[in-house]
Each structure stands twice: as structure tokens, then as C-alpha cells.
């Protein structure tokens, strides 16, 4: 038995390893095939040729179902020394006029989530030319040319010493979702969905109880 899993190549998603570890313990004959995926582009399925996806704010269209397994505050990512970085937290309004990242061929619907277009009521000012990938994005932020946003849990895993994260006191939540095809009756996929649902419920209960490590 084999299960192919797409995941965001540009986020530090190792925190979800225990979920798949338990799946393998419950399904000892199962092997996992991993598909790192780049930033979403127009016309590309979030899953590609994978059977399931573990994705941050996926663009789930017709023929796909999803389950939210985590919800995290959004934070702003900026260069060390940026005037706003002296604060422990800022408001969304503080960054709406900043220049944001742009990525080559990025699906504008996904980009609008991270540039907070719904709060601004208009598209953001974007860096030009667009960057090619996650490493180039971090270099652009570290240079002071742009700012970005990310889930709070991802901020400590950004591999560049020239960037810092600042909490957004009124920022949106960012969802991590398990995604699968609606017509997929593979029992392994269904087992993963059930396990992920139980995992998400347990994490929420622990967070509500204030237990350490539940976030």
C-alpha cells in the first residue's frame, strides 16, 4: 500500500510528522510518498498527482474536500531593523501601505490572502520584479525591499537571520488543511481523514485547556 502526500515546500511543516507516524503505526504495510509543492499557480490543482495534501490555506475548488487541522494567528515578517519591528505587536493597519512580496506566476487569489487585500479593500503594493521562490522571498524581506506574512508557527522556522516576525493583534487566522478528492474511496485516505479529525479535536481541546505544546 502506498499513499502520496503533497505538502508546502516553503513552510517548515515537520510539526505534522507525528500525525503520519501514527498513520504508519496503524497501517504497518503502508509506505508514504512525499510531493513537495511550490507556491500555488493559476490552473494548477493543489494536489497535483498526489492523493492527499497537507497545505496552508489551499485553494480548494470543485472536486476537492478539506479538513482544517490547525488554525494559527498570522504574523508579519520583516527585515531586522525595520521601524515596526521594535514593537511586540502591531495592527494590520500598520502594514497595509507597506510593499509586499510578489512571487512569479503566483495565483492572485492565494497572494491576496497574504497581502491582506480584504482588509485594504484593494491590491497591495508589490515588489518588482516578482521573486522566484521561497529563498528569494526571504532575501527580499531581509533586504528591506518588502514585507511578508506567515502563520505564527512558521515564523521560527524561517531560515534567514535577517528577518523577524511581529504579531498582528487583529490579524486573520491561517488554516492548515488536509485536502483530498471528493470521490476518493481509498480506505487509507479515509483512515487519514479520521485520524486527522481526531488529531485536530485533541489539539483544540488541549489548547482550550491551556496545556503547553498544544498550539
Q: What is each model feature region?
A:
Residues 29-30, 61-67, 72, 139-184:
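Beta-alpha-beta core module
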